[in-house]
């Protein structure tokens, strides 16, 4: 009889205990405040735009990658890959301050002009001279013949007619017609004599 009395006492105790309601329809709305339900639906278009705008900038992502110990492959190029020996904009080095000399500047140096005239005036069957240079820069055959008949140096006449061109363009003609001797003279003048002349005359910069 004792086990039966114990079982009845257990039933009475269970009847007094509150029974948990497991019906989902009877869940209290207050539960969502304590345990928010995760929204698993796809975001709408407006939400996508908001998410995109709220994304951290690339700099933050880069810093995050560096903090994690991984190099950033999309960052700026390494210094070794960048161009070497290139001057920046508004550079104040001596090479950038000097303007490119023109043939007009070359004509003011009588010593240099005499050397070029001696090298380009003579006519040789296998050596390119002033005629080839002048023809390349658009001088007609009649003009070439006319300059040959004049007592003045034809090389000087050719240079006077192209005085607005740069000395660099003249050196390109020397390379084109394999006149390395003339190019060497011009190169030495540009590298050594021209900087002295340009710095010695400040009025050229104004």
UniProtKB/Swiss-Prot annotation:
It comes from the Eukaryota. GO terms for biological process: cell differentiation; signal transduction. Its main location: cytoplasm. Disulfide bonds: none annotated. Gene3D superfamilies: Death Domain, Fas. Keywords: Cytoplasm, Developmental protein, Differentiation. This is Ectodysplasin-A receptor-associated adapter protein. It comes from Macaca fascicularis (Crab-eating macaque).
